[in-house]
Amino acid sequence: NLDDLKVLAAIATIADIMPLKGANRLLVQDGLKLINKGRVVPGLRHLLRKLKLEEHITEDDFAFTIGPIINASGRLYDDGASSVLDIFVADWRDYQLPYKCGKLIDINEERKKRLRNAIDSIDLPTHKSTPLVIYDPDWGEGIVGLIAGKLCEKYHVPVIAFTRTKSGQLKGSGRSIPGIHLKNVLDSIPKDILIGYGGHEGAEGLSIKKENLKRFEKEFEKAC
């Protein structure tokens, strides 16, 4: 069903923090129209009911309520994304849909708690005018993007937050501000520092070796 795909594409566009311009904006506008006409898959309908968002859905509802709930399960659990997919492909005969949607909301509350604890553990100055690179081995891969986003919002500078993976590498997530294209910044960093990276102007994911952290920090600040 093309309408179902339009709705899912709209949610994915906002949840992945894609720039809302051109085709992306059209996708989101079409998705919002369909949702507000009630033309949504059963799983999303149950989720909206749980959230009491059945009246008029806005872009802010997508970005600050629906998107974080959908993302939370995959951030915190290795198989979390599959549980979200299970909800979105289910039909009306799945009597467990209300429970599954409630579970997603509970997981998002857990995600909020972990994020608060992580932010509270960071010792940073009141003001910061230069790009920021931070690292903590215990944060967990699922919340580094959220940490970067919070600090980017607080200091209004580009931020990369790193944590340690099971393999010993550092996995990072970045958020940027208008005027600084994060993908272009990482394109300009020496390739021997980066194991891999990908994203767009506002958000990036990347991996480096731990021994390259200090060097990355210097190159990142210089490139910004």
Write out the residue ranges for each language-model feature.
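Hydrophobic helix-and-loop "lid/oligomerization" segment in the mid-to-C-terminal part
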Residues: 2-222
